[in-house]
Structures are given as structure tokens and as C-alpha cells.
Design a protein with these regions (language model features):
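Alpha-helical transmembrane segments of multi-pass small-molecule/ion transporters
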Residues: 1-324
């Protein structure tokens, strides 16, 4: 009984536990007398492990999805136009006004808009009564768009010193494209080669969730390091928080509106609003101003708070209906 209660508590508060673990681990390691070499080695380790975790999360998710489950809908077009359109607009702003005093906030917002759908979105969509097939299809579509657009525009938005656009494009492409598309290809190949192994992997339903918790903790440790070392002001941090909140409200709101037109508001809202924030954090500290990775951390709070509220409302509604 006690073990069950502990498991329920950990699962219910995984977000908070991961965030606290990630933030506190940075300060603990900083205070330990390990030396700069050890700290640098651990940071390099995180940079290697983080993409692997993201890859595995996506791979295990796509192992559970059979091509016959995929469903196209017109709302997916509107969601794609919103995400890619806002990303293009914000990139254009930074290219035209590179010295703007709101650069960090704009970078944070563009991260939140282009960030692909979370692997957990299918689960939440199903619990809220939406269609898992259309959500999964949108996850594939937005991953394809991100894999193409990010390498094309990020080098122009945040040029690397001493690196040509072509070189920067190839560097970003080599990191983003395999990370988002290889899990899809690998899952489909495994399904064709060994359906039994694919089914076995798909049976571990909680594994992507646990990998996400580890990846989130590592991402927040790196984000905390970036925040401390950048000496960013409270005002800038608050600006990034507001930018991520607005991006969250806009995407959930417009996603729901688009889905309502085609009888699928829950799936459309979750597909557009629930994000793979670990990817956003990784992209922020890897390709943009490191402090912009805060946007992913804040967004993780906003979308999880909103979904927790939705699930609580649904549970209350079902309880009331059962009482009648």
C-alpha cells in the first residue's frame, strides 16, 4: 500500500521532482570541490546524453504507433501554419533588427512556437477524450517541419563567429535532422524487420515518461548554469517567462479554435500547445543565446499546469456524472 502511494506521488509530481532535481544538482556539483576539469567533463557528458534521451523518447513513442493509426485532418494545416508562420516572423524580426533590446525574449518565443509536439501529447489527448491518431500524425508532420526549418533559419538568426552560413547550416542540420527523423525511420525499419521486438518495446508504456523526467532534469541543470553564468537580470528572466506564457496561450487557444471547426478540438489543442520542452531547452543552449533555454523551462510549467487543470476538471465532471 505504501509503495503504491509513493509511486502515485512520484508520478503525480514528476514535473516538480525533475525540475527540483535538475536545478539543485547544478548547485550541489558547483559546491563540491571537483575542479573545473571535472565540471567541464560533466557538461560535455550532458551534451552527449541529452540528444540520445530525446532520440530514445521519440523512437519508443513511434514504436507504439502503427502507420494504420495515422489520420490526416484539415486542422493540422492551420496548426502548421501557426507554428511555422510565427517562427518565420520572429526569425525575420531578429534578422532585420539583430541589436534589439528584446532579443532574448524574441528568441525564447520563437523556440516555443517551433518546438515540436510532446511525446506525451497522445496520452493526454486520449485521457481528455481526443483522437490519438490525428495527434500522432501531427507529431510526425511538425517534426518534419522543424527538421527542415531550424537548420535553414537558425544560422541566419544566430550566426556563429568565424563560421559561414553553409557551415553553420550543415552543423545545425547534422544535429537536428537525425534527432527528429531518425527515430521515425528506425521505428519503421524495426517494425518491418522484427514486429515482435517492436511490440515488446511498445509494451513499456512508462519508459518514455521516465526518460523524459531524466532529460528534463539534465536540461534544467544546464539552463540553471546558463542563467547563473550569464548574470541575466530579473527583468529579462521575467520577459522570457511572459513570452513563453503568451506563446502557450496562443497555441492552445488557436489550436482549439482550428480543431473545433473540424470536430476535433482536444487533439488540435494538445498537438499545438503541448511541447517537447526538453528539445526546446536543448536547442536554446545549443544554437541560440543560452539563457533563452529558460523559455523551454517556463513553457514546461505553463502547459503542464493547464493540462493538470483540464484533467482535474474532467475527473470532477466524470465523478459528478457517476454520482447522478
Amino acid at each position: 500500500m505504501m509503495n503504491m502511494q509513493i509511486r502515485m506521488f512520484v508520478r503525480q509530481w514528476t514535473l516538480a521532482i525533475s525540475m527540483i532535481a535538475g536545478i539543485s544538482s547544478y548547485f550541489i556539483l558547483k559546491w563540491l570541490p571537483l575542479g573545473n576539469d571535472a565540471h567541464s567533463l560533466m557538461l560535455q557528458g550532458v551534451h552527449i546524453v541529452q540528444p540520445i534521451l530525446i532520440f530514445l523518447m521519440l523512437f519508443l513513442t513511434f514504436c507504439r504507433v502503427h502507420p494504420s493509426q495515422l489520420r490526416l485532418s484539415r486542422w493540422q494545416i492551420w496548426n502548421l501554419l501557426l507554428q511555422t508562420g510565427m517562427f518565420l516572423l520572429l526569425c525575420l524580426l531578429l534578422i532585420i533588427f539583430p541589436e534589439t533590446s528584446f532579443r532574448v525574449e524574441i528568441e525564447g518565443a520563437l523556440l516555443c512556437f517551433i518546438c515540436p509536439t510532446a511525446t506525451a501529447a497522445v496520452v493526454v489527448t486520449s485521457k481528455l477524450g481526443g483522437r490519438a491518431g490525428t495527434t500522432t500524425t501531427y507529431t510526425l508532420l511538425i517534426n518534419l517541419c522543424v527538421a527542415i526549418l531550424v537548420p535553414l533559419l537558425v544560422p541566419a538568426v544566430h550566426p556563429q563567429q568565424g563560421m559561414t552560413f553553409t557551415h553553420a547550416f550543415c552543423v545545425v542540420l547534422s544535429k537536428v535532422f537525425p534527432l527528429l527523423l531518425c527515430p521515425i525511420i528506425a521505428a519503421e525499419l524495426l517494425r518491418r524487420i522484427s514486429p515482435s521486438i517492436t511490440s515488446r518495446l511498445a509494451s513499456y508504456k512508462d519508459l518514455p515518461f521516465h526518460l523524459w523526467a531524466i532529460a528534463l532534469a539534465l536540461a534544467l541543470a544546464v539552463t540553471t548554469r546558463s542563467l547563473i553564468n550569464s548574470h541575466v537580470s530579473v527583468g529579462v528572466a521575467a520577459g522570457v517567462a511572459v513570452a513563453s506564457l503568451l506563446a502557450c496561450i496562443i497555441q492552445f487557444g488557436i489550436g482549439r479554435m482550428a480543431g473545433s471547426k473540424y470536430g476535433d478540438p482536444i487533439s488540435a489543442a494538445q498537438s499545438c500547445g503541448q511541447k517537447n520542452t526538453v528539445f526546446a531547452i536543448w536547442m536554446g543552449y545549443t544554437f541560440l543565446t543560452p539563457v533563452t533555454s529558460l523559455a523551454g523551462g517556463f513553457y514546461s510549467i505553463w502547459h503542464n499546469v493547464y493540462n493538470s487543470w483540464q484533467l482535474a476538471q474532467m475527473k470532477k465532471k466524470n465523478t459528478d456524472a457517476g454520482a447522478k
